[in-house]
């Protein structure tokens, strides 16, 4: 693919984060894909390519399959927020202890992605927005220091006039994801180059550059928030404070040994929170959070030259993307120009064709109780199904759109129809 303006470039950071989390945090992975799909559907038809359309159509089908194995609820935003705060806290603790490295920058960047996808649930609280900006800035600042051969400066900006705003690269307002990273873009290649170790020369990992002009004040402008490296303050919710998070041990940690344990959300937390059940207050597990060993990017070679697919996470037994120090996990996503596999077989392959319930006979008339009022969960599910139908129509997938519309109608009119299935 020679088009440098491929719209699908902006979706890859969210899809790559979803791949990393698929096994141990499928709910967060689902919302990463949902956010990517919603962004993708906003791409004007005139700007879409065959690659764009293929990714979006496959995303719709993948989300439908993922929903069957998940239990969605109105409180999912709290779970995603808690996970984002935990990832942020892990990077922040390592940075403030003076141990920041390229892995720390990648973890900060991943946290900024998780903070960003919270916007799909509604307005983001100011403290989360500040952490989002700080995480993105910190990723760039650490990367810049390593590139210049100096030790990253721990904690907040030394200069009060340092710009913490997120670099913008387009109408979406998100920072640039287009830098080349040979370790991450192999997800979406038709022909793959040998993977590169993430510990190679740092020039292989492109992060947003730190802005050179002063704008807003420092992130922590409250004196009470200028906490020392070893005793961070509690975050603005009941999620565990940084001092209960495991100390980072370097990029060689095995990712995802324990799933994230969600903690209830309260607006006014006590001063000191107990650690979550997966942590020990004295000997915390260093592996309870993922190590994000790649920086999302999109190089020219990452786009196929033929009509691609964005199928399941089990397209190939050897994943295209994995941590360099851990065994490959079957959670990668790939493009393929070969004929699609069967819809769903015992070896884990999933076809990108939609797997939907059989449609009722066209001769069957639809009857429903007009006095029935569906609950909020059913209305939310019906809205999602309707969105999928609109997305399918954008690719002339009429039959798929009809099935989603029928599902939406069923949720709104049938008391026995189940939400989240």
Swiss-Prot record:
Transmembrane parts of this sequence: none
Compositional bias ranges of the Basic and acidic residues kind: 188-207
Stated induction or repression of this protein's expression: By Pseudomonas syringae pv. tomato strain DC3000 (PstDC3000).
Bilayer topology annotation: Peripheral membrane protein
GO cellular component: cytoplasm; endosome membrane; multivesicular body; nucleus
An annotated Gene Ontology molecular function: protein homodimerization activity
Biased composition (Polar residues): 165-185, 278-293
Post-translational modification note: Phosphorylated by activated MPK6 and MPK3, this activation is required to trigger multivesicular bodies (MVBs) trafficking upon plant infection.
Residue numbers carrying N-acetylserine: 2
Biased composition (Pro residues): 245-258
Localization: Cytoplasm; Endosome membrane; Nucleus; Endosome, Multivesicular body
Keywords noted in UniProt: Acetylation, Cytoplasm, Endosome, Membrane, Nucleus, Phosphoprotein, Plant defense, Protein transport, Transport
Annotated region (Disordered), positions in chain: 146-374
Subunit and partners: Homodimer. Interacts with SKD1/VPS4, VPS60-1, CHMP1A and CHMP1B. Binds to PROS/At4g24370. Interacts with MPK6 and MPK3.
Function: Involved in the endosomal multivesicular bodies (MVB) pathway. MVBs contain intraluminal vesicles (ILVs) that are generated by invagination and scission from the limiting membrane of the endosome and are delivered to lysosomes enabling degradation of membrane proteins. Thought to be a cofactor of SKD1/VPS4, which catalyzes the disassembly of membrane-associated ESCRT-III.
Family in the record: Belongs to the VTA1 family.
Name by which UniProt lists this protein: Protein HOMOLOG OF MAMMALIAN LYST-INTERACTING PROTEIN 5
Gene source species: Arabidopsis thaliana (Mouse-ear cress)
Gene: LIP5
